[in-house]
Regions:
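Beta-propeller folds
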Residues: 1-252
């Protein structure tokens, strides 16, 4: 894969000749010394099926959480690794969606769980490193069976976001990444037919939405007033152009 820079390290994956599973590597920004953080080929040796789903690294660069599917059902275990000692934490998180997000305290991770029957992603939990999964806190449960939910961190590194989506509706909740114990706050309540995605940048959010145009427009709002009544048009919708996505950068 193409290396990407995160918090002073480049991260990428690579297949060695004859390998069925990749190596996951990193190196410091100004160094040529590679560090193998996961050896997929070696890890797969005891399993008939093996797939690494997702991984995330703590803000201090010292801890890695990663997910594994060894059942071929997209039901993942999450394991946590100390990248300094190369040793695993004692706990394993079972029956997850495979998605992982570190809070900025370097000791809390957010992850999703699936409905055991439908395999719909419907719960978001928080886990404190070094504790049993039975002690994890249910942060959000999506009871509407037409919606699925997942958690991620904004590109700004400032918010944990819980997204609930169906075919024609979206709803987001925000948790400050530096305060993972805070109750999630709704960005804009779900409405049938209202689709939107959010992108945080400095003191505001950019919103890609079909609120004012079926081909979507880009709106902005203050991070302190996020309801749709506060959205202001930034890029108008057009009949001849469908806006499919956007990204934000510090210097562009």
């Amino acid at each position: 894969s193409v290396p990407y820079l995160f918090n002073g390290y480049y991260y990428w994956s690579r297949y060695e000749k004859g390998y069925e599973h990749p190596l996951y590597l990193r190196k410091k920004e100004n160094s040529e010394q590679e560090e193998i953080i996961l050896d997929g080929q070696k890890m797969s040796e005891d399993f008939e099926f093996f797939n690494i789903g997702d991984y995330d690294v703590s803000n201090d660069n010292n801890i890695m959480a990663y997910s594994l599917d060894t059942l071929s059902r997209r039901i993942y275990q999450i394991k946590i690794k100390d990248l300094i000692s190369d040793k695993l934490y004692p706990e394993t998180l079972e029956n997850t969606t495979g998605s992982i997000v570190f809070a900025n305290d370097n000791e809390t991770i957010f992850y999703g769980k699936k409905d055991p029957v439908t395999l719909r992603s419907f719960q978001i939990y928080s886990h404190k490193l070094g504790t049993n999964q039975s002690e994890d806190v249910l942060i959000f449960q999506e009871d509407d069976e037409t919606f699925s939910c997942y958690a991620y961190k904004t590109k700004s590194n400032e918010y944990i976001v819980i997204n609930s989506s169906s075919t024609l509706s979206d709803e987001y909740r925000l948790i400050p990444a530096g305060n993972p114990l805070k109750k999630p706050e709704i960005f804009q309540k779900r409405e049938r037919g209202l689709e939107y995605n959010i992108y945080h940048h400095q003191d505001q959010f950019y919103i890609l939405t079909n609120k004012n145009h079926h081909n979507f427009s880009v709106e902005t709002c203050s991070k302190d007033s996020t309801g749709k009544e506060n959205w202001k048009e930034f890029i108008s919708g057009r009949e001849d152009v469908l806006i499919e996505g956007l990204d934000v950068f510090d210097h562009y």
